[in-house]
Each structure stands twice: as C-alpha cells, then as structure tokens.
Curated annotation (Swiss-Prot):
Gene3D superfamilies: 3.40.50.360. The keyword Iron-sulfur does not apply. FMN binds at residues 10-15, 79-81, 114-120, 135. This is NAD(P)H dehydrogenase (quinone). Pfam families: FMN_red. Belongs to the WrbA family.
C-alpha cells in the first residue's frame, strides 16, 4: 500500500480547503492510503483568535518523526512574502535528523499554496519551498499541462505547473474557486499515481 501525507498550515482556512481537495484527488487512486495532517501553530491562541485565525480544524497535528513513514508528502502553505509561512518553516527546520540519516531520500514531494493576489508570490512560494525538499533528497512533482484547468483564461485563477494555488484577496474574503479546487484534486491524483509507480 502506497502511503501519502497531505501536510499543511492554514491560518484562515483557504489552504485547509485546498488540502481537502488535494487529499480527495489522491484518494481517487486505488491502493493509496491518504493521511491529512497539519503542522503546529506557533502563535499563542489568544493572538491567533484576535487575528481572525480559524482555530477549529479537524486535521490532527503531525510530528516530524512520522515523515519517513510516507512514500509521498504534499505540502500546503500560505505565502509569506514569497516564501513558506513560519509555522511550516519551523516544522521543516526540525527535520535535520532525517537529512542526516537520509530518511527522506527518494520520497516524493509536492507543494500547493495560497496568496492574496495574482502577483502575491504563488510561484516563488512553491519554488523556494522546493529547495528544502531537494536538500532532503526528495523527488519533486508538480502539475503538468495535461491538467486543462491550468489553461483556463475565462477567469482569474490560481494554479501553475509548480502546484495548485488559490487567491484569497487581501482581506481573505475570496474562497478557492472550482477551477482552483480542480487543479488541487488533479495534483493529489497525479502525485498519488506517480508515487504508486515509484513504490511498485
């Protein structure tokens, strides 16, 4: 059985919604066991609540120790000035022992994100994330243009060959569109199919 983890951080719920879509796509592939988890929050609860954070999220908290158990990990992070968020960075900075032991070498890695606008760092957030995965020896998988939703010119939409993304607007009022969720589901399915072949 191929084991795949969707691991995310979501402050306002946009990445959480995308994560569920990614997991849905991955679950559509037979003989792939999909787990959905999130990284720990760093902000004190009161500060997070005052900032409007969505604190009630069903996904359990992941541990660094469990990462080698999976054949693939699809990471989801909101952008922070074109980079991953501090919560995800803090989590990954604790994976030094996996780097030392080579525990993640050959694992499949993929990334999706959320930004405030079309030009808010969708692609740089994902590509800058890739450097961490490459240092761990992971094999990066994106979203090929066989995903027709990437070619949608009829609306403003996130998504690129680097990975799925959504545009939240500066005030967070915009929720992931059906086109963006389609790309997210495609990414989950594509990574699952690729990983299954690698494991076999």
């Amino acid at each position: 059985m191929t084991k795949l983890l969707v691991l995310y951080y979501s402050m306002y719920g946009h990445v959480e919604t995308m994560a569920h879509a990614v997991a849905e796509g991955a679950r559509s592939v037979e003989e792939v066991e999909v787990t959905l988890k999130r990284v720990p929050e760093l902000m004190p609860e009161e500060i997070a609540r005052n900032a409007g954070a969505k604190l009630a999220q069903e996904a359990p908290i992941a541990t660094v120790d469990e990462l080698p158990e999976y054949d693939a990990i699809i990471f989801g992070t909101p952008t922070r000035f074109g980079n991953m968020c501090a919560q995800m960075r803090n989590f990954l900075d604790q994976t030094g022992k996996h780097w030392m032991s080579g525990a993640l070498i050959g694992k499949v890695g993929s990334v999706f994100t959320s930004t405030a606008s079309q030009h808010g760092g969708q692609e740089t957030t994902i590509t800058s994330f890739h450097s961490t995965l490459l240092h761990q020896g992971m094999v990066i998988v994106g979203v090929p243009y066989s995903c027709q939703a990437l070619l949608n010119m009829n609306e403003i939409t996130g998504g690129s060959p680097y990975g799925a993304s959504t545009l939240a607007d500066a005030d967070g009022s915009r929720q992931p569109s059906e086109n963006e969720l389609t790309i997210a589901r495609f990414q989950g399915e594509h990574v699952a199919k690729f990983t299954k072949k690698v494991v076999e």
